[in-house]
Amino acid sequence: MLARQQPRRVARELSLLSLSQLSRKDTKPETLEQGDLEALLLAATRTLSGEVHEILETASAELSRSHERLLNSEIRASNLNSAKAMLEEAMTLTETVINRLALAVDLPETLQLAGQMEVRKFALELIGTVCRRRQQIDEQLQEAMVDWQLSRLAKIDQDILRLAIAELDYLGVPQKVAINEAVELAKRYSGQDGHRFINGVLRRVTEKKTDGAPVTPGEPR
């Protein structure tokens, strides 16, 4: 049985997708009004809706390729080794299809939750906090990164970090929860090792808050 998604986790995902829209606009984050935030949230919801169709189309194409490999293993394979290789490729493609479909099954619930007042309220609060406190948040992140530059990170990684700091400093979310949720967002939207980097940066931020000790230069743990 599929686990039910948490409303706040959906709100975080919507917030991240909303912030990604800002990079495509000339509007400065700190000048956004409530109507602008609502429009960003609507665009994020539509992005999720389009993702369902894209996932299903990709899964369908991969399933067709898997079927083709199975046929080739029976008809064209010249020996046992080549047949085995084709079967393994077909199995890998099928596994990928199953994983994609599992994600597609979750998305309708995400879209349903996105329309709930509780989810929208927290998402708007998150987006608004990041926009209003952008300078303070970025300064804190840059200090924790030391000889790394926040501006050189992928935009999606910057926004994941900003959301986490907004939760930690301004919304009263416990450290462990804020960091874990940021890591989960990174696993889905960041690069291959993005979640480890983000975890390291946020750990440094919280350690610095706790003991006030200077941060040692180098890559975040």
From Swiss-Prot:
Gene3D superfamilies xrefs: NusB-like
KW Transcription regulation (keyword) present: yes
Assigned keywords, A-Z: RNA-binding, Transcription, Transcription antitermination, Transcription regulation
GO molecular function, one term: RNA binding
Gene Ontology terms describing biological process: DNA-templated transcription termination; transcription antitermination
UniProt xrefs under InterPro entries: NusB-like_sf, NusB_fam, NusB_RsmB_TIM44
CDD domains: Terminator_NusB (cd00619)
GO cellular component, one term: cytosol
Keyword Signal: no
NCBIfam families listed in its UniProt record: nusB (TIGR01951)
Job of this protein: Involved in transcription antitermination. Required for transcription of ribosomal RNA (rRNA) genes. Binds specifically to the boxA antiterminator sequence of the ribosomal RNA (rrn) operons.
Annotated family: Belongs to the NusB family.
Name the record gives this protein: Transcription antitermination protein NusB
Lineage of the organism: Bacteria, Bacillati, Cyanobacteriota, Cyanophyceae, Synechococcales
